[in-house]
Amino acid sequence: MQGPLYIGFDLSTQQLKALVVNSDLKVVYVSKFDFDADSRGFPIKKGVITNEAEHEVYAPVALWLQALDGVLEGLKKQGLDFARVKGISGAGQQHGSVYWGQDAERLLKELDSGKSLEDQLSGAFSHPYSPNWQDSSTQKECDEFDAFLGGADKLANATGSKAHHRFTGPQILRFQRKYPEVYKKTSRISLVSSFLASLFLGHIAPLDISDACGMNLWNIKQGAYDEKLLQLCAGPSGVEDLKRKLGAVPEDGGINLGQIDRYYIERYGFSSDCTIIPATGDNPATILALPLRPSDAMVSLGTSTTFLMSTPNYMPDPATHFFNHPTTAGLYMFMLCYKNGGLAREHIRDAINDKLGMAGDKDPWANFDKITLETAPMGQKKDSDPMKMGLFFPRPEIVPNLRAGQWRFDYNPADGSLHETNGGWNKPADEARAIVESQFLSLRLRSRGLTASPGQGMPAQPRRVYLVGGGSKNKAIAKVAGEILGGSDGVYKLEIGDNACALGAAYKAVWALERKDGQTFEDLIGQRWREEDFIEKIADGYQKGVFEKYGAALEGFEKMELQVLKQEGETR
């Protein structure tokens, strides 16, 4: 059957990927362009250029033009019938900004299908580079953003996050100070996601409602740019000029932005009624890679740990991030990012293997898992024993804001007493379960208040906990995740490889163009998503008694963090 097809693009730091799906959400084509391996003429490493003297990390925008032609050529070689493509959306690395020059709209409109995008659009930008999320050149600007509304908590309350180096607002502030003449000649500023949509539209696309929340400029509660923060950011050119540069932000994440530009119709054979849907950020796109229901939790267990949740509750805090949901009005995306994830667990795993010895061909996690499963929750052999808890940070952490280090405590929930200790711990064995507990207790602590009771008198908790990334293969980690976070429906391993962002973007296009009036993304995708193709239940979720015991531990865990922060002279 020659049904409609939809393309989701993922413009990440190291590659551009396109995933083509049909109405049943089945992937039919994939094309990738690896920036380091496939590009010509750019002095990049891992997709970026680094200026260590100023802590700058940025990408040449022309590289992305070369990549888009490359990915579309790849789909053409595979035999994709472009005329069947009904809709296009995308995901872009969050926070990055693209600076368009005064000729941008004209150059986008006048593309010649006989020439490449790179040849024709390299002159469309007032500045040839886009700051990357790894850039940390904006400490001064972040301090100003945090102070401007009266503190980091006030900024988080307004925009969903405190100031971060990578966020677009602080980056624009630094840009207009460093390059005042270039800033004056900048006609528009796009995010990476809206830049991608602009290329397909043949004119500059509006910002996406979810991705706009990664700027420290969008007031989430007001649903508008924050006038005070624009004032801080705009400099001598003024607020109205910056508003014009940024443009309007439509509320509907599935809005029809317009039809595909003539260039793609003539060069690749796209149909003239192929519709462009707003592209969103890579993190919001990730929660669209499955029908994530409100209160479902998604935990990415890679080198670092990322926790994503869809929630109707807006409860901002300087340690977390809130964004408008990319498709569903009235919902928010909650996000936590930790630097210490898999690396910290591996340190303890290696210490255990050094002590116990391990045959070379054996699973390196076997000892760690066995000890974790044999150790009682919180290391309590009996209820009267103190709970063992600790913080294990081989690298500096951002949640909470602490130097690299290890801290171990005994906590007595009966009287609330907490003591730092090195005695009574059998190291490294006791640390196996303790580190997994520490990581999941931090998630539970910071997502408190975002979940509701699933009914039948059960305490508030997620419906499902989805684990992705390397750590999701580990049965002991999955079991402890369920014991601490709960999950009335259980703990699931989600198998979408590294395709989450592109899949989410493709699903967004399907939803936007095939939804019935008022039909939510979760409803439409939920009806078509074949969960047996993507997920496997790997552990129980809520267990009566155990979940409550960890609830008592949570009070001690929060006390422990505050005590260590106080000792280290830091404040949250």
UniProtKB/Swiss-Prot annotation:
GO terms for cellular component: cytosol. Keywords: ATP-binding, Carbohydrate metabolism, Cytoplasm, Kinase, Nucleotide-binding, Transferase, Xylose metabolism. InterPro entries: ATPase_NBD, D-XK_euk, FGGY_C, FGGY_N. Its EC number is 2.7.1.17. ATP binds at residues 365, 470-471, 474. Signal peptide: none annotated. The keyword Kinase applies. It is found in: Cytoplasm. Gene3D superfamilies: 3.30.420.40. GO terms for molecular function: ATP binding; D-xylulokinase activity. Pfam families: FGGY_C (PF02782), FGGY_N (PF00370). Substrate binds at residues 95, 166, 282-283. CDD domains: ASKHA_NBD_FGGY_SpXK-like. GO terms for biological process: D-xylose metabolic process; xylulose metabolic process. It catalyses: D-xylulose + ATP = D-xylulose 5-phosphate + ADP + H(+). Induction: By D-xylose, L-arabinose or L-arabitol. It is an enzyme of class 2 (transferase). Belongs to the FGGY kinase family. Highly specific D-xylulose kinase which participates in the catabolism of xylose. Xylose is a major component of hemicelluloses such as xylan. Most fungi utilize D-xylose via three enzymatic reactions, xylose reductase (XR), xylitol dehydrogenase (XDH), and xylulokinase, to form xylulose 5-phosphate, which enters pentose phosphate pathway. This is Probable D-xylulose kinase A.
